[in-house]
Amino acid sequence: MARGCLQGVKYLMFAFNLLFWLGGCGVLGVGIWLAATQGNFATLSSSFPSLSAANLLIVTGTFVMAIGFVGCIGALKENKCLLLTFFVLLLLVFLLEATIAVLFFAYSDKIDSYAQQDLKKGLHLYGTQGNVGLTNAWSIIQTDFRCCGVSNYTDWFEVYNATRVPDSCCLEFSDSCGLHEPGTWWKSPCYETVKAWLQENLLAVGIFGLCTALVQILGLTFAMTMYCQVVKADTYCA
């Protein structure tokens, strides 16, 4: 009976971790594709230049693949050490995500202030050598969200030391349109515009976060259940 339960949990554990590993492969693949085709796309922070979409996806994908691999081998080999390692790693990830979420909501005002200051510092790197990712990211954000600057289009005046903005701030794009009158530029601040967009899509973000948490809890349950079954089977055989 104990052996039959163990086999059932074993196959469920293996299937779960195989999907987990394949998901990591997909995330890693997207990260590598972004790095190869878009450079350091979406690098907006001057304090953390390596914090790009591509790098985040590559690190996340690699870590998920590693955890999934440990889980798969642990399930196939019915290895208590690997199963416990998988459980501990996944539990640490879950606790880290929960801690980050709590801190984010607890210090949202301070994070807002710091983020705006850091983004304004990053504006000074716009268009400079070695900062193609930051330049592309700002151009895309200002064009797609129809905004200009972090808190105001005048943020760019300090960057250029002139009454000028990037061409991506223009209502109607044309070469050197950023040198025209302010009436031809977008007036909405990018930080508040993007923040409002995220708040409008908060339900989707919440559902994604909830699904992620449920998957992790499922993985923890499978791992601990199988670990206990392996211990019982070993005791029964002894």
UniProtKB/Swiss-Prot annotation:
Transmembrane spans: 14-34, 56-76, 86-106, 202-222
Localisation per UniProt entry: Membrane
Keyword Transmembrane: yes
Keyword Glycoprotein carried by entry: yes
Extracellular side: 35-55, 107-201
Leader peptide range in chain numbering: none
Keywords per UniProt: Glycoprotein, Membrane, Transmembrane, Transmembrane helix
GO annotation terms (biological process): mitocytosis; regulation of mitochondrial membrane potential
SUPFAM superfamilies for this protein: Tetraspanin
GO CC annotations, alphabetized: membrane; migrasome
Main localization of the protein described in the UniProt heading: membrane
Top-level taxon of origin: Eukaryota
Cytoplasmic side: 1-13, 77-85, 223-238
Gene3D superfamilies to which the protein is assigned, alphabetical: Tetraspanin
Residues that carry a glycan: N152, N161
Bilayer topology term: Multi-pass membrane protein
Subunit note: Forms a complex with integrins.
Family to which this protein belongs: Belongs to the tetraspanin (TM4SF) family.
Protein name per its UniProtKB record: Tetraspanin-4
Organism for this UniProt entry: Mus musculus
